């Protein structure tokens, strides 16, 4: 059955794809404007699915999808995630109400992502482990 979601639900997947593609989270100022030269590299994103938990680990220029035990399931260039994020953003901007995005759903299945959002009892879709560069002392 095809995944159907509204703009907000698809935006959660867009965020996952964009973060994995860029590999970093940018800081913002008090007006929520991106500070381009201040960012935190992403070490890993954790996502809970019905089938279990999956770790999306950034290694070099790849996203490595693993089980919590560290078993590698799939390795994909991070650049592919950026392309898919842009395709999804285009679909989000072109649609209203509830809609499907079959090509993105196919990619989601490939990367062990089978739901648009977390269970209603859990408001956390993803957990991000960051590398805080300010903690490095030379």
Task: Identify what each model region corresponds to.
Residues 1-134:
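Short, surface-exposed loop/strand segments
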Residues 136-138:
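Conserved small/polar residues in nucleotide/adenosyl-binding loops
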């Amino acid at each position: 059955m095809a995944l159907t979601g509204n703009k907000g639900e698809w935006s959660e997947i867009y965020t996952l794809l964009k973060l994995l593609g860029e590999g970093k989270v940018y800081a913002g100022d008090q007006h929520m404007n991106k500070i381009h030269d201040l960012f935190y590299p992403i070490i890993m994103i954790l996502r809970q699915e019905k089938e279990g938990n999956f770790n999306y680990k950034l290694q070099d220029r790849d996203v490595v999808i693993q089980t919590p035990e560290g078993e590698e399931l799939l390795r994909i260039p991070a650049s592919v995630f950026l392309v898919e994020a842009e395709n999804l953003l285009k679909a989000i901007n072109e649609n209203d109400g509830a809609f499907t995005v079959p090509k993105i759903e196919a990619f989601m299945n490939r990367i062990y992502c089978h739901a648009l959002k977390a269970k209603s009892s859990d408001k956390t879709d993803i957990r991000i482990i960051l590398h805080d560069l300010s903690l490095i002392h030379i």
